[in-house]
Amino acid sequence: MPVSYNRISLTDSIGYSEILDPKLKTNTLRIQFFHPLEKESAAKNALAFSLLTTSNAVYPSMEELAKKLDTLYGISLTSGVTKFGDFQTCGITVRTIADRYALHQEPLLQEMTDLLLTCLLQPNCVTDGFTEFEFQTKQKDLLDTIEAEINEKRAYATAQALETAFQNEPAALSCYGKKEDVLALTPQNTLAAYREVLHTAPAEIYFVGAESQPMLLEKLKAALTPIDRPNVPSYTFHVPSPAKAEPVTVVEPLPVNQAKMVLVLKSDCDNRYVMQMVSYILGALPSSKLFANVREKMSLCYYCSSSYSTPKQAMIISSGVEHDNLEKAKAAILEQLTAIQNGDISDAELESARMSIYNTLNGIGDTPGSHINWYQGCYYWNNYHTPEDSLKQYLAITKEDITKAARTLKLDTVYIMDTKKEEA
């Protein structure tokens, strides 16, 4: 039997999607809130959602919650924040085996739903703030996450490039906030931020399992309908970033052995399918021009690849380069783009891109999370369709379409993490 999908409005501002895949032996439930990415709230939201799945009012310590999870066949309970363009997504996910596979057919779906709702609606707090011990523990974890991003130089270089490329736009921010933002948090203002999300942010709930669960829908409706959410806005998630009049170059000397260079180019083409194809031809694959030519033939980069931000309409090209090769590498990278703009696309390159897209789309459904990610993407675009529908869109794209789209790309930002010279 094929996968079936159905979405209904649980309330005016909460959607409920049921994704049924007969091959699954697990049930997965996720709730996601969508909040504008803001300096004032990013760190608060990141910390708050990590606290929600650390303990709650019913299981008021990490140990007690862990024991509860162990009694339920090791239910997976996770939370986290991510970034999509100008928005921060904040979510909680629970997953366990389907009831019929439990040793005594225990009502695990009901238990995991109750657990998610308890975490969501009954956080562990005292005097209008999260409890101090859990707060300090998760605050340190968040600081460690931010520090790890800084220490991972490739990711850091990309983040710095985007900060310049999207200057004065929410997309310039990290979904975790900055270290100083995290250090300024208190149990009180973190709980207040969570309550603001709960009462004002649009939300989507996703259930993925083998069978329809009417009980689940009724339980969610009974728990969430009473929440006071009077004026929840609806958002447009596709917010293209305008290109700068002239490219901006930022050079940051750091004590690294290998320089990093990130180029950000912006487009006014709103066809995300064809722009993704441009990226596949340019640098998203081992068969792409950047890897085959700049890295392999010219030996100018240790790595060189591209990715495309659909909500911001921005192409991001990331490379690791020796200091002495920075200018050569930049010129060579832009030459590969020029080649595409001039129609230099081989049949093999086009077929490789199509095959990669086919494999990616064909893999949707291998995990419950891939189902959710697909339909959350549909939510962002307010366009619900299947992976098969998308494949048809991609396969219809011609070399001429790719060439025309590539010509819309304009260099916006060059970020260079340069090797710091030791002082004599």
Task: Please place each PLM-identified region on the residue numbering.
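Short, polar/flexible loop-turn hinges at active-site or ligand-entry regions and domain interfaces
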Residues: S55-V58, R100-L103, Q122-T131
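M16 family metallopeptidases and their MPP-like homologs
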Residues: S17, K25-E38, A43-K44, M62-T118, ...
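Hydrophobic side chains in well-ordered alpha-helices
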Residues: M112, A193, L216-K219, V274, ...
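Acidic/histidine-enriched alpha-helical segments
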Residues: A66, Q122-I146, P233-P242, E335-I364
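Active-site SXXK
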Residues: N45-T53
